[in-house]
Amino acid sequence: MTEFIPFIILIGVAFVILSIILSFVPVGLWITAQFSGVKVGIFTLVGMRFRRVQPIRIINPLIKATKAGIDINIDKLEAHYLAGGDVNTLVDALIAAQRAEINLPFERAAAIDLAGRQVLEAVQVSVNPKVIETPKIAAVAKDGIEVMARARVTVRANIERLVGGAGEETIIARVGEGIVTTVGSATTHKHVLENPDMISKTVLSKGLDAGTAYEILSIDIADIDIGRNIGAQLQTDQADADKRIAQAKAEERRAMAVAKEQEMKAAVQEMRAKVVEAEAEVPKALATALREGKMGVMDYYNMKNIMADTDMRDSISKVAPNEKKYEEE
């Protein structure tokens, strides 16, 4: 029994070595490639292992391309994989382009994929146009009525401009700008409601797909509604603003009038003070005139009589209105 121990150990070591070799050498994948008509060396697959490339990610797409009649270099696929591209999607896009008779070289497809675009979706949109629906866009006609429109834009991907071309957001923004311009130039909102195709024709004629990754095939107005009366609202707001301005100016004038009244009252009080001051000087002047002989005694008494007569007249004038008031009561 002991004589079989070295043989068993040898078999175990051989099995371990074979397992290690098979983990680095994808023999099953190599056999599949050979039977699929893909000429790839076993050492090429081993090299992929050392370059941290999963051979199945390269060989399976290569088999699909070969079966579809597309000649692709395995080194290009590996380089695209190492650059972060999706090899499987790339090959699917090349096959779809070939079936649709679209000229799509490998280099352009790889550039589109590495640029972050969905290359397969781009090919599909080139064959089957895509419909982009815009949100409701509000615009105001010349008569002040708000018109809200929603459009459907049918686009086809432009393979030549996918790299560096603007996307759907730019298309939506340009269509919205065209709708606002067209509605804003309309004389009345009724004209827009009667001819909604006027919007699509005007917008389509502006060449909105310039510099984008899409080619606009048609623009259709899907829905159109009437919104607020912006003109009337603006006039109301302006009237309110004018009213507030007029009220502010009136309040300013009232304040100035009150201030002027207070100034006049102060001036009257000042004049009265001066009169009182002047009246206080009269007795002094009379005494001086009598003392210096400039005024006689009879003149003085005549003046006193005149003053008494004046006071009596003032008293009568003050009593008469009160008596009349009592008679009326």
Swiss-Prot record:
Subcellular location: Cell membrane; Membrane raft
Listed InterPro entries: FloA (IPR022853)
Membrane topology of the entry: Multi-pass membrane protein
One CC-aspect GO term: plasma membrane
Keyword Transmembrane helix: yes
Keywords: Cell membrane, Membrane, Transmembrane, Transmembrane helix
Pfam families to which the protein is assigned, alphabetical: FloA
UniProt superkingdom: Bacteria
Transmembrane segments: 4-24, 27-47
Principal localisation: membrane
Description of how the protein assembles with itself and partners: Homooligomerizes.
Role according to the record: Found in functional membrane microdomains (FMM) that may be equivalent to eukaryotic membrane rafts. FMMs are highly dynamic and increase in number as cells age. Flotillins are thought to be important factors in membrane fluidity.
Entry's family note: Belongs to the flotillin-like FloA family.
Name the record gives this protein: Flotillin-like protein FloA
UniProt source species: Alkaliphilus metalliredigens (strain QYMF)
Taxonomic classification: Bacteria, Bacillati, Bacillota, Clostridia, Peptostreptococcales
